[in-house]
Amino acid sequence: GASCDCHPFKGTYWFGTSNCPSGHGYRKKCDSFF
């Protein structure tokens, strides 16, 4: 299963903005895509 957490947007494998702080470039990091 996917393990998604919100982190500052830095990479390629980052998806979505749901449940992430707004206005700070946060995205979901899904480890399952690495």
From Swiss-Prot:
Please give the superkingdom of this protein's source: Eukaryota
Task: Kindly indicate where the leader peptide sits in this chain.
Answer: none
Cited Pfam families: Defensin_4
Q: Where does it localize?
A: Secreted; Nematocyst
Q: Does the keyword Zinc-finger apply?
A: no
Please describe the organ and tissue distribution of this protein's expression.
Highly expressed by the mesenteries. Moderately expressed by the pharynx. Weakly expressed by the gonad and pedal disk. No expression in tentacle.
Disulfide bond sites: C6-C30
Query: Which Gene3D superfamilies would you find in this protein's record?
Result: Anthopleurin-A (2.20.20.10)
Question: From the Swiss-Prot or TrEMBL record, what is one GO molecular function term?
Answer: ion channel inhibitor activity
Its keywords, alphabetically, are: Antibiotic, Antimicrobial, Cleavage on pair of basic residues, Disulfide bond, Immunity, Innate immunity, Ion channel impairing toxin, Nematocyst, Neurotoxin, Secreted, Toxin
Q: Work out whether the entry's keyword set contains Zinc.
A: no
Annotated membrane-spanning segments are none
Q: Which GO terms describe its biological process?
A: defense response to bacterium; innate immune response
An annotated GO cellular component of this protein is: extracellular region
Q: What is this protein for, i.e. what is its function?
A: Peptide with both antimicrobial and neurotoxin activities. Cationic AMP with antimicrobial activity against both Gram-positive bacteria (B.subtilis) and Gram-negative bacteria (E.coli and S.enterica). Shows no significant antimicrobial activity against bacteria S.aureus and P.aeruginosa, as well as the fungus C.albicans. In vivo, induces reversible paralytic activity towards the shrimp P.paucidens. May act by impairing sodium or potassium channels in the prey.
What does the sequence similarity comment in the record state about its family?
Belongs to the sea anemone type 3 (BDS) potassium channel toxin family.
**What's the protein here called?**
Crassicorin-II
The record lists the organism as: Urticina crassicornis
